Amino acid sequence: MIKSALLVLEDGTQFHGRAIGATGSAVGEVVFNTSMTGYQEILTDPSYSRQIVTLTYPHIGNVGTNKADEESSQVHAQGLVIRDLPLIASNFRNTEDLSSYLKRHNIVAIADIDTRKLTRLLREKGAQNGCIIAGDSPDAKLALEKAKAFPGLNGMDLAKEVTTAETYRWTQGSWTLKDGLPEAKSEDDLPFHVVAYDFGAKRNILRMLVDRGCRLTVVPAQTSAEEVLKMNPDGIFLSNGPGDPAPCDYAITAIQKFLETDIPLFGICLGHQLLALASGAKTVKMKFGHHGGNHPVKDMDRNVVMITAQNHGFAVDEDSLPANLRVTHKSLFDGTLQGIHRTDKPAFSFQGHPEASPGPHDAAPLFDHFIELIEQYRQSAK
């Protein structure tokens, strides 16, 4: 039996539709993502913790779901909003249709609403808190109360909530059309030891590091600098993650200690913001953030434009940059800061997602730059 669903924003705007996931309610910050494909990667990206994701492309679910496309061990998005769910999922990799996948993971989702209207509203007013209720008779008053009660992401430290509980090793490379996901590589074949902080790390980031010869020790978000330095890493990676970077004082303190050494540092997304904060810069909450796979970014060093994947609601304030941070990348949508590099240390970061998943790979050479810094560090240490 088809069940009703209702999305209510904190300003009182209502969207009536059809439930395509679990029965119940979901509360979070409502954002929109412009990616045409990759809905499963988006749902399982830890950076979407406490967020309800609106997908602007009208047809979502065409290719179903499969195990290989998951970016983490669970769905982290609080809820899903789409225009149309196809009747049939058709793809040679499909193992489960999207609706069944959402129900199995207990994710509340709504379809058959005007996502263009919702996106325009979020773009004009900014990201809003919202509530989806799915069931026989969704209560609009209750949904509004829940939406207004949600505290928002400002000041919310979510990295320590989504991080791994235990340190683990990662040596698996990237998926290929010919072979699918490969077996884990032997550590003897991976010359560079990189410690990766898991603030909400996506698996494809880890795979792309392995592709470049890194054997990874993935550590919890609150791991101290002293513990990491005892591991004798050739490089330290700061992952993506959800929430506000400013409350992550444990990470900022650790990064400041790493910056007293010459060990190469590479940060992505939240890791980028944390490197900036540890260097003395400030971060700000954006109006509606960047979420999608079609964002143009200018590489200031090479004077070229890259199309990138983005997923963030906070940004580094360029006006707050200290003298030892130089700008390497800027958004061509709104001019916000996208990349920084320390002038006195082998440390750099990027706001977007060079690993894509989903999205283009124009920014993938940033991983190669990290390897170059690691090789230089190892040479100087001899």
Curated annotation (Swiss-Prot):
It comes from the Bacteria. The active site is at residues 269, 353, 355. One of its GO terms (molecular function) is ATP binding. It catalyses: hydrogencarbonate + L-glutamine + 2 ATP + H2O = carbamoyl phosphate + L-glutamate + 2 ADP + phosphate + 2 H(+). Residues 1-189 are annotated as: CPSase. GO terms for cellular component: carbamoyl-phosphate synthase complex; cytoplasm. L-glutamine binds at residues 47, 241, 243, 270, 273, 311, 313-314. Its EC number is 6.3.5.5. SMART domains: CPSase_sm_chain (SM01097). Residues 193-380 form the Glutamine amidotransferase type-1 domain. Small subunit of the glutamine-dependent carbamoyl phosphate synthetase (CPSase). CPSase catalyzes the formation of carbamoyl phosphate from the ammonia moiety of glutamine, carbonate, and phosphate donated by ATP, constituting the first step of 2 biosynthetic pathways, one leading to arginine and/or urea and the other to pyrimidine nucleotides. The small subunit (glutamine amidotransferase) binds and cleaves glutamine to supply the large subunit with the substrate ammonia. Belongs to the CarA family. NCBIfam families: CPSaseIIsmall, PRK12838.1. This is Carbamoyl phosphate synthase small chain.
